[in-house]
Amino acid sequence: MLPSIDGRIVLRDWKVAGLTREYETTAATFGADGWIIGRISMEPYAGKARVPARRNGAPVPRKDFVAKHDATSYAIAIDPSGKLRWDQSDIDGEHVITVLTESVSDDYLAFLQSKGVSYLFGGKSRIDVAKVLRKLRKSFGIKTLLLEGGGKINGSFLAADLIDELSVLVAPVADGSIGTPSLFDVASRRSPARSLKLLSIEKRSGGIVWLRYMRSR
């Protein structure tokens, strides 16, 4: 992740050279099988295709749909209500998997199948992220995954204690925006705070600091 010094993750008006380059360079060192983000973060990549209404046809079973299981990398979206309008089934060659709840419409499932977009069900009305990770490993062989936001998705993984390592590129920016998403946002009165063990600190170009932690057992 790429937060400001005060933990904000929306890069609006951040005048720091090389942020994207440093992010991509450090992310590549993990050799991950794919990356996972929330619906809002994925919207710029998805497209604006129309979801056609089916006039006839049997109900679409609420079963996982695997369009491709041998991709070299995967782009995964958490999209509980089925709002992303995919133009194609990959992002720069990375096969798209979308994670849904069973409440999505038959029209949307038929649309995803027509586009060749794989989908998994993470629950009936809410996403169980632990269940999703098990399915990703079983159906696609995904063992290492980059969790890349936004704050609510990060928070759901934190609350479920599913983050093995935390890699943070701290930008030399004090953002100060009120109401801006932070690195972890959890909608719960009970804090899911986790203890971490520092692995390394590295100064990168442009005043960026790369912090790496692992969870403390």
PLM features: residue spans?
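Enzymes that bind and transform nitrogen-containing heteroaromatic metabolites
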Residues: 1-217
